[in-house]
Swiss-Prot record:
This is Glycolipid transfer protein A. Beta-D-galactosyl-(1->4)-beta-D-glucosyl-(1<->1)-N-[(9Z)-octadecenoyl]-sphing-4-enine binds at D48, I49, T50, G51, N52, I53, T54, K55, H140, Y207. PANTHER family: GLYCOLIPID TRANSFER PROTEIN, GLYCOLIPID TRANSFER PROTEIN-RELATED. The keyword Calcium does not apply. Residues 45-66 are annotated as: 2 X 12 AA approximate tandem repeats. GO terms for molecular function: ceramide 1-phosphate binding; ceramide 1-phosphate transfer activity. It comes from the Eukaryota. Accelerates the intermembrane transfer of various glycolipids. Catalyzes the transfer of various glycosphingolipids between membranes but does not catalyze the transfer of phospholipids. May be involved in the intracellular translocation of glucosylceramides. It is found in: Cytoplasm. Sequence repeats lie at residues 45-55, 56-66. Its main location: cytoplasm. InterPro entries: GLTP_sf, Glycolipid_transfer_prot_dom. It holds the Pfam family GLTP. It comes from Xenopus laevis.
Length: 209
């Protein structure tokens, strides 16, 4: 599971502040996750994640001290942009990025929990569908939702997906699942902290893309 474990997310401090530099370093390797799904149909989600990472990094690098944590970015942009906030800058980029990260988290957790289609246990459509419905569906219009339904037909078999996560190495499914669980510990905590931060700051928007 080197694709995931090589770039583990760091544990959060007690105050749940997320260091921007560390976060960007870890999250920048996640777009490759969508290559493991084996279809160009998933490329829009990958491109969206990549683009939002770039926007956040640009804001951070403009003043690393001022934007040391993700919360400092939101607070700084709120003060800077006034009534335009939160639909602006890195605040908007992180809002969409966290949804893409949530998609990955729910999908991997579903696989780790053993959720599957009993009629087709080696398919991961059930896991992908759950992740999409929880993380992204409500923010997508009718056309994008239809495109996603089409993408499901191109989803790989579970063994092919796990092998891709392992960078082509043939490993036992139990070992892959255990490494997914290890990755999810800090990753899930980080995603949850971002969602809580957005709710506390009233930065969440529900418009459809």
């Amino acid at each position: 599971m080197s694709l995931l474990l090589q770039h583990q997310f760091k544990p959060l401090p007690a105050d749940k502040q997320i260091d921007t530099c560390s976060f960007l370093d870890s999250v920048s390797h996640l777009p490759a996750f969508f290559d493991c799904l084996g279809s160009a149909i998933f490329s829009p989600i990958k491109a969206d994640i990549t683009g939002n990472i770039t926007k956040i990094r640009s804001v951070y690098e403009s003043n690393p001290t001022k934007f040391k944590t993700l919360q400092m970015i939101l607070e700084g942009e709120k003060e800077l942009h006034g009534p335009q906030w939160p639909k602006v800058g890195a605040t908007l980029a992180l809002m969409w990025l966290k949804r893409g990260l949530k998609f990955i988290q729910v999908m991997l957790q579903s696989i780790a929990d053993g959720e599957r289609d009993d009629q087709n246990p080696n398919l991961i459509k059930v896991n992908i569908t759950k992740a999409y419905e929880i993380a992204l569906q409500k923010y997508h219009g009718w056309l994008v939702q239809k495109l996603f339904q089409t993408a499901l037909f191109a989803a790989p078999y579970k063994d092919v997906f796990l092998k891709a996560l392992s960078k082509g190495q043939t490993v036992k499914e139990e070992e892959c699942i255990e490494k997914i669980r290890q990755f999810l510990v800090n990753y899930t905590t980080t995603i949850e902290a971002i969602y809580i931060m957005y709710n506390k700051m009233n930065a969440e928007l529900d418009y459809k893309a």
